[in-house]
Amino acid sequence: MGIPRYFRYIAKSFEGILYNAPNATLHPMHFYLDMNSIIHPVVQWCIETYPAYVTEQNRVESATDGRYHTDMNYHTRFEKAIYKELARRLDVLIGIVRPTKTLYLAIDGVAPRAKMEQQRIRRYKSGYERHRLEEIHRKYQSTPPPSWDRNAITPGTIFLYKLCKYLECTYLPTRRKESTVETILLDDANSPGEGEHKIFEWIRKHHPRADTDTNTEATETESGTDLHCIYGLDADLIMLSLCNPNSIVLLREAPEYYDSHESRERIADELSGTEYIYFNVDAYKDRIIENMMELISVSNESDESDIVPSSLTTLNPTTRSGLLYDYVWLCFLFGNDFLPHFFGFEIKAETVDKLIRMYVNQFKVMRRHFVDIQTGRMDMIAVKQWFDTLYANEMSFITDYVKHANYRKPRNGSNDTNSTPIQMEIERLRCHAYHLRSNTPAISNMERTFQQGSSAFNDIHDAYYRWYFGIESMDANRGFIQTICRNYLYGLQWNIEYYVTGCRDQEWYYPYRGAPCLRELSLEIAKNQPIPIPDVSVRSAYCPIQQLLFVLPSSSFGLLPSAIRTHLLKQMGYYGNYYPDTTELEHDVLFKVYLYECHPFIPYLPVAVIDEIIEKTKGGLNAFDTCRNQRTHVLKIE
């Protein structure tokens, strides 16, 4: 679920949840920073500001036998510039929040396998775009803007290891001497887990509150409830906060995108040109619940049920938490980093509101939540009824989606008469999907099938499975479709556990390009009720070098330890199928417009292949390589 689209939806749909930062009424005691949300823009700023440093950095990194690859105390001018700007921005953010109890910096460590699949797709897509841009500049004999392989911002690389050491040994000790905050902590890239999930693991462990212990005001209360502030740009932070009973505000840069004049005017009044904003999660929780309660009341005015109280303060706390968990679970259906969205689902107000109304209609009849807040397990009776309802409305979702997709055209298109030829070609690359769809008969024919509406319901399903799963005959592949459905259902269970209690199954991932159709999912649940959701023991995280081998395309092999890089390059005849050339990728352009929306079709990489590579090269790792591959824990800065 992309944060720009989701955040835009929230800002348009709910008033009173955004505040200027700093804010006199908000006094967080605990401040947590999802550091990758700072590192990436800092690196981009330094690339644009210091082009000579970038050139030098690329030269130093390419000398694989040089000091850069063996001396962990050697820092380039580019790295020093990044450290300086990173420190400046951290000082600004800490100065806004002024925490008194906890300052916690979390950097993305080794991710669960499900996240690695998404990272791999994203890195291949970036490699494809980078190569195409280089081709365009060569064609017009133009000097390209400075570039640097930002895949280096991955656990296990030299760059990120040294950046973590800078924070540990230089920045945070200085901050410790100058600050009155009680506890300063660093959760670096060698500690497993995504940054935002590590933050919430810490909150759950050190600030436990029952889901029935709710507080609807994000301020410091007389009872001593601590207010937690988290800096970050990821939509995951919103979902994680909704599943946590603590009082939380999110800090982020003020957004600059709203679809309508009315939205822009309202947000401008609320924020008055501030650079940073607070997102009040407790207020957002209230708006979600108020919206649901209003729909329940309107749809069943004569009902004397206890789920329609006179105010939020009298709402059954268990019901409140259950409604919020269900809301998060519903958002998974729009897709996230771990599961693709259902065909016909996209984050826009009409679709989200339609699903909420359907959910309310089911809940007021069944009084069952999708998720049991005590166990974190899905209630398959409620889930079955839900997918039956979605299946009954599947064609309307698809029709609305296709209609909206056909209206979409590139903004600021390449036909601008003031554009130079190179600008027009770069713009055409940005709108890669739109132009490829227009000029590829096979794709145009496929899209026409989806435009036929309910009269071609079976044809639409056949076309969908052929495009995303390579299935020519659904009748001959019922067993495969059953496997797809069961994988997806387990993925929903995995997701809610990941957001509520943390990740137990590090190895699970969804191995397909698309979600099953609602018809097949509904029929599968009905035929095999209850669907078995396997219990798994806690599975340990992968190591940093394993993640590098999972997520890096061959164009970024320079970031690997020398022994591994040499082995891979010598054996590309064998490993090449798992590491395809980024210049020759096919993309999913169906009903897409922009390149950033398209996922490349790349082969899945078995963990056995990764383990084989590591086993064959482990004797060639030097001391620096070994340090980069070690697992760490949260470090307290004394």
Where do the model's predicted regions map?
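Noncatalytic, typically N-terminal accessory segments of nucleic acid-processing enzymes
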Residues: 1-638
